[in-house]
Amino acid sequence: MDSHAALSTLCYMEKDGKYLMLHRTVKKHDVNKDKWIGVGGHFEADESPEECLLREVREETGYRLTSWRFRGIVTFVSGDGVTEYMHLFTADGFEGEPAACDEGQLEWVDISRVWKLNIWEGDKIFFRLIDEDIPFFSLKLVYNGSGGLVSASLNGEPMELFDILNEDGTKTGLVRERGVAHREGSLHETVHTWIVRPAGTCDGEKKRWEVLLQKRSAVKDSNPGCYDISSAGHLASGDIPLEGALRELEEELGIRVSAEDLHYVGKHRGSFQAPFHGRMFCDNELSNVYVITRQLDERAFALQESEVESVLWMEYEECRTRIHEGTLPNCIYEDEFDMVGD
């Protein structure tokens, strides 16, 4: 199929905590067939985005807009030959009487329930950006031709995409953006690497160990300023756990090691919900846990400022006690820490 580009508007009208949604069920050859979307349509000759917006809303709903906001440009690449530059609006003022739409069924839907409808996965990204009142943005969404999200970028910068997992740890086939996954509590995969070193012996000649903790940056989206695993990170869609662990070590701490230096401990399932920066954060992860016992040269550490504020060596048993007693500000799962000590 030959590719072609189109200009369009897309508007989400809001009233009483609800969006006016259009269930696209009429057209047979519609890229949005059976999806729920906002109202809008393609530009006519010589129209500005606002002129197209006002005309399309009037034609599809019967309403005349009196207050609206231009939120951003969404570049939609369907993967089957359709590329569309959507001018995204929200509107909170309108007048007139509702009219039936010849492209599907119109329904006022609670904004919280919109996420549960049959919508494009990438639409959840711009719903999140709107909800967080992000300034005017450019969002690019690329699909695989079968409705699956392949890539997303915000203002020219790639966004993190995760493979979403079933409860048994297998992949669902769904790919979801990081912020959306943490809003919905979607199960995804991570890597956790603990760095330990000998710290002498204690009574009975039992070997003592120290563990390296990182202090999370104050700008992190969860648990800012807390002590955490030596190195940790999400697996991007398609990533292999061991390769992801090696990458995170280099990015966060500036450490280059070989795959043979990482000893696999097992998998850990962890989840929590808590508010950060005024928004609820819902983490739900399946972590691949590794341990490094090789002596590392601390002088070679190069901390990634956006992720890591500082690092701290602490004797393992002392750390375990302080985690249990809550005297160490941390976001470490106690049962995972026990895995490291076994």
List where the protein language model places each region.
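Residue-level signal for well-ordered, solvent-exposed loop/turn and beta-edge residues enriched
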Residues: 18, 69, 148, 168-170, ...
